[in-house]
């Protein structure tokens, strides 16, 4: 039976969680194209980040994490900036940071540039068209206090490509003793879980955004898969956490030599439904750096 329009049928969540836990492992990953650059897809993805409280909460979560890991006036290398929403949340929270952000998709980079100019933060961010699996020497040899990779790894088509990206992150950390923040979707056991959960928690979200989220979850690596590849790349011993009760989001992090003892920013710009969603996400995450 369908819930009335606008009502979130949260009473269905326990059943979704139980089915996920009972489902046997072994679900096959369904890769996505490495570069999302179709103008219509980029536009829908970008606008969804502005209008959707759940996505705003996810971006705020990443901003709070990076805030806890980066020192005052720190330098951040962001791999896979996309349309810029996640990085915007970081820089608006921490206007002291200087960031170089990398992506391969021209339309994503152009969208991010417009966003940063509209928000008046473009002076703090340098955008570079580059492959995160083979960084230019100017970036690989740069001095960084932290390196972030947010909502990007699921776009990598093959495990060998993932390994290339993780080797770049490991090299930056090794050279600089830099902090690391990695966040992404996790592929669940039950292939129906993500769609069912979205119908519960975000029933009014546009269909194109829900389809994108389901495709991203299907393409994502599991926590165990990603943990093993991180260790193999030289990033062993990282802290990790995941969303609860359904572990559809995951994060790995490590402090750097100059990481602060506590977060530098103290307030959140979110209001209303987005602030509520951010609180629920933060409280539900199994572990986090803040």
State each model region's role.
Residues 2-71:
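Conserved class I S-adenosyl-L-methionine
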Residues 77, 83-134:
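Class I SAM-dependent methyltransferase SAM/SAH-binding core
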Residues 134-141:
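Short conserved loop adjoining the S-adenosyl-L-methionine
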Residues 148:
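A conserved beta-strand element that flanks and buttresses the S-adenosyl-L-methionine
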Residues 156-168:
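A short, conserved alpha-helix within the catalytic core of class I
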Residues 176-184:
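Conserved beta-strand signature within the Rossmann-like core of class I S-adenosyl-L-methionine
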Residues 183-230:
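C-terminal alpha-helical "lid/dimerization" subdomain adjacent to the S-adenosyl-L-methionine
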Residues 237-252, 256-290:
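Rossmann-like AdoMet/SAM-dependent catalytic core
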